[in-house]
Amino acid sequence: MLVYRGHKGRLEMKVTARGRSAHAASNHLGDNAIYKLLPIIEAIKNMEPQLGDHEFLGHGKITVSDMHVKTPSINAVPDEATIFIDRRMTFGETKAAVLAQIEACIPVAVRDSVKLAELFYDDPSYTGYVFPVEKYFPAWAFPEDHPLVQAGQAARGVIGLAAAPASKWNFSTNGIYWAGKAGIPSIGFGPGDEVTAHTVNDSVSLADVVKATEFYAVLASQIPL
C-alpha cells in the first residue's frame, strides 16, 4: 500500500447518429444509425497510441464504454444510436484538444447527422432542482515534497511499512474535483489492488483494511502545524 499523489483527468462524451427507420426486410429504405458510428468506433479503437504521455501520470486512455440504440423493434433498421466515450487525460492534454480529436473521427459525409456532445451530471435533487456539472476534470498531481505527501510517507513509516516513493492511481477518484478543480491538497492511501477493480476478482484483504485504519489514525499527527 502506497501513498498516491495524483492521477489522470477525465472527460466523458457521447456521439449520436441519426438515420431513418425501415423494416429489416426492406432495409434499403432505411438509413442505419449504427453503421454511421462504425468508422468512428474504429478510429477511437486505433487512437490510443497517439494520445499524450507523461513520465509520472502515464499515457492517455480512451474507451467506447457503452452504446444505446433506438429502434422500433429488433426487426427494424435503427434510426438512432449513441456511443459513450470515457477519455482519461494525462498532463498536457486539454479538453478542447480531446473534443477536436473525436470531431476529427466523424466522416465528413455524415457530419449533418452525427453529433458529438459532452456529458453532464444533471440528475435532479430530491427537490427537483437540477444543477448541471460537466463530466470533465483535469489531471492533477502534487510534488513528492508537498507537506501532505510527506506526512503520508511519514505515517507509512510509523505503521511499519517499508519506505517507497509516492505513486499515482491509474483510475479516477474524488480527487479529480478536490485537487483537480478546487486545488485542495489531496493524497490517497487504502487497501485493495486497483488492478482488479471492476473485475470478477475485485476484493480487499482484511489485513490491509486493518493496516489502512492504522494509517488513517496516525496521518493527522504527521501533518506539520
Residues covered by each model-derived region:
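Metal-dependent amide/peptide-bond hydrolase catalytic core
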Residues: 4-225
